[in-house]
Design a protein with these regions (language model features):
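Structured, hydrophobic secondary-structure cores that serve as assembly/anchoring elements
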Residues: 1-104, 108-116, 127-133, 137-146, ...
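Short linear motifs in intrinsically disordered/low-complexity regions
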Residues: 83-84, 94, 143, 161, ...
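Generic N-terminal simple sequence motifs
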Residues: 93, 176-177, 194, 198, ...
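A broad "ordered helical/assembly scaffold" signature
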Residues: 115-119, 186-192, 434
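Intrinsically disordered, low-complexity regulatory regions of eukaryotic regulatory proteins
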Residues: 173-174, 183, 192, 271
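Long, low-complexity, polar/charged, intrinsically disordered or flexibly structured peripheral segments
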Residues: 181-211, 216
């Protein structure tokens, strides 16, 4: 008797992630031009420092997490790429500022980057009762606050202080001196920055700093190597504009490059900010006559939102892109990517730079300006879900993002097809696999139709795969879907009858 395993039926397709943002801007510390994965605000603060006055990257990332965002990538610009991750200065040589090295407990301690305050490293007693003499606790403080705690030993084990710090610390490195002691002396050392330390905001900024280069992995050009990103925002483009470091033409050049990047990748959206302090007529003129963007891979939000400024202990207006990306992520998690990310509360926003009326909304919405509005008793809400495309087929943001999701999921879930025999059996398996995935999406409400036949079709047969295509090594599958679209306007028809009663039809 023999047992033979035979594959049968459809192979399941797993939906890809739809809410991974990428932010490009200025930070107090951290590696330059290196896309760094960040999963929460604590990780961001540990790697890139806290809020920096005069910049918007920290506020955007904080607003993203506050509004429901998950993983994101952060790219710090303002200096040349430092492959060692030490946060080299604008000169790009990766040199640490003088005074950023000290000796503690028989070890040489070096700061990877200096934040807004001094970095202090302390050797403290090990936790627990009667610890071994070789064990101790290494505390790393930034501006007096403990940000890293390492339980280590002087012995050459996997818990050796040099090994642990190298693997886990984002702020310091530790090296053994000539004769490392068996017991680390208790004490502390401050790694102070001086005037030569790199600043969060460079003295000179150009459009190329944001755009970067794909080959050198700089700017948002370096994001091409990360396939999972679905949104791109550059909040500090506006901080440079406010400091007159970049002109309005430079702003347009960077945003056009963002759009081109997203169109080329085909799986992500550019979340754009307008210039600050524009009234509705000015933003309409900027959208139509100055910027003139036309892309199904970009969305624009207006106006700026007012948030609490932890750096200045006050309130300030910030570009909305970070908060909007968080709203996208929250909507995807709660309702699905097919739901338009609108009519959602903007968490953390206490006011708006411009209070919009219904008539102003009707002026801006048709040209693709997604308004953020304040409603009595309902808070500050996103009140638009359009792309910047002039093509009615791609007018709605959720339609474009749904197609991105379906395309990426099907492409990823059918990699097993490559090098399979290109025959009727393969085509049937492809049809079953994709149909099963789309039926599941239809049941979630992502596709329009009372039945699966009304919602989509999958065609993979001799018609889509003639002999010429087979000889060329191609297998072609045609998929058509009917996406759901948002109800932007609700119309009520009221009729009055002579009897005094009325009928309302929705």
């Amino acid at each position: 008797m023999y047992v033979e395993e035979v594959e049968a039926g459809a192979r399941p397709i797993e939906g890809v992630g739809t809410a991974v943002a990428a932010f490009v801007g200025f930070a107090g510390r951290g590696p330059f031009n290196t896309p760094t994965l960040v999963s929460n605000w604590a990780q961001y603060a540990q790697t890139f420092g806290d809020f920096v006055e005069g910049t918007y990257l920290g506020q955007a990332v904080y607003g993203y997490f506050l509004n429901g965002g998950g993983n994101c990538y952060v790219v710090r610009i303002g200096g040349e790429r430092d492959d060692a991750g030490t946060g080299g200065g604008p000169s790009g040589n990766g040199a640490l500022p003088s005074g950023a090295t000290g000796v503690l407990g028989g070890y040489k301690v070096t700061a990877k980057a200096i934040g807004a305050g001094d970095i202090t490293v302390e050797v403290a007693d090990a936790a627990g009762e009667n610890p071994a003499e070789d064990r101790f606790t290494l505390l790393v403080k930034d501006a007096g606050k403990v940000v890293e705690t390492h339980h280590v030993t002087t012995k050459r084990t996997k818990e050796n202080v040099v090994t642990v710090v190298r693997e886990k610390s984002n702020l310091i490195t530790v090296e053994e001196l000539a004769n490392p002691p068996a017991k680390a002396d208790r004490g502390a050392v401050a790694l102070r920055a001086d005037e030569s330390a790199p600043t969060a905001v460079p003295g000179k900024v150009a459009a190329d700093d944001y755009v970067g280069d794909v080959a050198d992995r700089t700017g948002f050009g370096g994001l091409e190597a990360i396939d999972e990103i679905t949104m791109v925002a550059v909040p500090d483009l506006m901080s440079a504009y406010q400091r007159d470091q970049i002109s309005l033409e430079g702003v347009k050049a960077v945003q056009l490059a963002m759009i081109a990047h997203c169109e080329q990748m085909g799986d992500r959206m550019a979340v754009l900010d307008p210039p600050p302090a524009l009234n509705p007529q000015q933003v309409r003129d900027w959208r139509q006559n100055v910027a003139g963007y036309d892309s199904k891979y970009a969305a624009l939000y207006y106006p700026w939102v007012k948030v609490f400024d932890a750096a200045g202990d006050d309130h300030l207006f910030v570009p909305p892109s970070g908060h909007m990306a968080g709203v996208w992520a929250r909507t995807d998690a709660g309702r699905g990517v097919h739901k338009a990310p609108a009519n959602e509360v903007v968490r953390g926003a206490v006011a708006l730079q411009t209070q919009l009326t219904k008539n102003e909304q009707e002026l801006l919405n048709p040209i693709g300006v997604n308004c953020v509005r304040s409603f009595p008793g309902r808070g500050i809400r996103v009140w638009g879900a359009r792309t910047l495309s002039s093509d009615p087929a791609w007018r709605y943001l959720n339609v474009r993002r749904l197609f991105n999701y379906l395309e990426e999921s099907i492409l990823s879930g059918t990699q097993w097809v490559v090098f399979e025999p290109n025959d009727d059996a393969l085509w049937a398996r492809i049809r079953r696999t994709i149909s099963a995935f789309l039926v599941n999406e239809w049941r979630k409400g992502a596709l329009f139709g009372l039945t699966p036949d009304e919602a989509f079709y999958v065609k993979c047969d001799r018609e889509t795969n003639p002999a010429e295509a087979i000889d060329a090594g191609q297998v072609v599958c045609e998929v058509g879907i009917a996406p759901v679209k948002p109800a932007e306007f609700v119309v009520f028809r009221l009729a009055q009858f002579s009897g005094g009663t009325s009928l309302v039809n929705e």
